[in-house]
Regions:
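N-terminal signal-anchor module of multipass membrane proteins
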Residues: 1-79, 87-102
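Juxtamembrane interface elements at the cytosolic ends of transmembrane helices
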Residues: 4-5, 35-39, 43, 182-194, ...
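Intrinsically disordered, low-complexity non-transmembrane regions of multi-pass membrane transporters
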Residues: 1-23, 225-241, 432-445
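C-terminal ends of transmembrane helices
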Residues: 14, 66-78, 121-135, 185-197, ...
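Membrane-embedded helical hairpins/re-entrant loop segments and their flanking transmembrane helices
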Residues: 10-11, 17, 39, 43-74, ...
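Short, non-helical or kinked segments that cap or interrupt transmembrane helices
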Residues: 76-89, 134-143, 200-207, 285, ...
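Membrane-embedded alpha-helical modules
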Residues: 102-223, 339-445
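Hydrophobic, membrane-embedded alpha-helices of multi-pass small-molecule transporters
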Residues: 20-35, 171-184, 203-205, 209, ...
Length: 445
């Protein structure tokens, strides 16, 4: 596995990248992440007005940027990008509505719960317990299974949410996604066939594909220029904790401690995926510092007035495609997010890129993540028990992404949170099965 990963990387995590190139490649990660989607969904769930929705979006960009830079430079010290998860959205809306709504004490109660949960994560990292948990519970075969399930769980989102069920004519959606994906594949093929232009076409493949897809969508009348024109050039985030205030409610706090536990499981899968694509064995120090960085990122998000920002697995797929894993690129991505937090017109431009264009690239990214997980598993000496450790989590991942919404909605609230995170269910299943089966010796941490 090491040779394969090394040969696929053009630029390693600690390799320097010129500022201009890092800026462009950082934007490539930003475009692939769809960070604006969860806050837009949450704003709709809470019936926010235009001002509140814009404020939530700006706060999310700002928190994602600060969190990304914190993790990459000071804590995890790996190419890691932070962004909002879909998992807490239902709980967040529920807490707000149960506490008086937006005009009552709702947001203050939500932010109070988020602050306490974030502090718990920081304390977990400071205690050194997180690394011990990983060493004890997550050998290589479990880690590879989690990575595989991370990629697998994202495929339906790439296809359904961004293409088949996205706004617009479904045939146009498929056409846009196909053109974008084909452009990406052509760029990668050119980089392999003609090594002299590898740097341009491999490292810039996603930006080129998104640019082509956006131009085609504009020719179809699918690009929303009005939303861009109506947006202000510059504005400070207005909906922070200073605006909403803070309040503490025990039930809400306990709810979000559970949510944070689920998010931590997802983030662990993201770090495994990033370690696999960069051929880096995550150290004990990185595990503990990473969870401290995760907690501080979520604390920043709460102070900014938005939901937790956690590790994004999409970026591992981007690295697999582009071959660039430089931390400077991720610092640039974090800087882009901060810029987007203040420049509403630029945010509106990126948000106006049609979902099928994003989906065409996203679908390929998810597959590369899944294959990296399978590659980790392939390197292990597996026996009969491993068939169940690997297979059952994959089955459950597929089952949960295909589970009808009416079944999920009928479940108790806490179970709904778990059902909303196939990665967490897969990880817990793999860990439990591994404990029940004969012990493995290959550790990832």
């Amino acid at each position: 596995m090491e040779n394969q990963v090394e040969s696929s990387l053009i630029v390693g995590p600690d390799d320097p990248v010129p500022a201009g190139e890092a800026t462009l490649l950082g934007l490539q990660h930003v475009l692939a992440m769809d960070v604006y989607v969860p806050p837009i969904i949450l704003a709709g769930m809470m019936a926010m007005g235009a001002a509140d929705s814009t404020g939530l979006l700006q706060s999310t960009f700002l928190a994602a940027g600060i969190g990304t830079i914190l993790q990459t430079c000071f804590f995890m010290k790996m190419p890691v990008s932070q962004g909002p998860s879909f998992v807490p959205l239902g709980a967040a809306a529920g807490v707000v509505m149960a506490s008086g709504g937006l005009r009552g004490n709702g947001m203050a109660t939500l932010l109070g719960a988020l602050v306490v949960g974030a502090i718990v994560l920081v304390l977990l990292g400071l205690s050194g317990a997180f690394q011990k948990i990983i060493n004890t519970l997550v050998p290589a075969v479990v880690g590879g299974t989690i990575i595989t399930c991370v990629g697998l769980s994202l495929i339906p989102s790439a296809l359904n949410d961004n293409i088949f069920e996205a706004t617009g004519n479904i045939y146009q959606n498929i056409e846009l996604a196909a053109i974008t994906a084909l452009t990406l594949l052509i760029c990668v093929a050119i980089s392999i066939r003609f090594p002299r232009v590898q740097k341009l076409f491999k490292t810039g493949s996603i930006v080129i594909a998104l640019l082509v897809g956006t131009l085609v969508s504009a020719s179809m009348g699918r690009f929303d220029w009005k939303s861009v024109a109506d947006s202000a050039w510059f504005s400070f985030p207005q909906r922070t904790m200073l605006h909403w205030g803070i309040s503490f409610n025990l039930t809400s706090i306990l709810t979000f401690i559970i949510i944070y536990a689920i998010l931590t499981t997802e983030t662990t899968g993201t770090w495994f995926a990033m370690g696999a694509v960069t051929n880096h064995k995550i150290t004990s120090r990185q595990w503990n510092h990473g969870i401290i960085g995760e907690g501080l990122s979520c604390l920043v998000a709460a102070l900014a007035g938005t939901t937790p920002v956690t590790g994004y697995s999409t970026n591992a797929g981007v690295i697999s495609i582009t071959g660039v894993a430089s931390k400077r690129v991720f610092i640039a991505a974090g800087s882009w997010f901060i810029v987007l937090g203040f420049f509403a017109k630029l945010s509106a431009f990126l948000a106006a890129i049609p979902a099928p264009v994003i989906g065409g690239v996203f679908a390929i990214i998810t597959v590369t993540i899944m294959l990296n997980g399978l590659n980790v598993i392939r390197q292990q000496q597996t026996g009969e028990s491993d068939l169940y450790i690997i297979g059952l989590p994959i089955i459950l991942t597929l089952a949960l992404v295909l589970l009808p919404s009416k079944v999920t909605n009928a479940a108790p609230q806490m179970i709904q949170y778990l059902l909303g995170s196939p990665i967490a269910v897969a990880a817990i299943t793999a860990i439990v099965l591994n404990l029940l089966m004969p012990l493995r010796h290959n550790k990832l941490a």
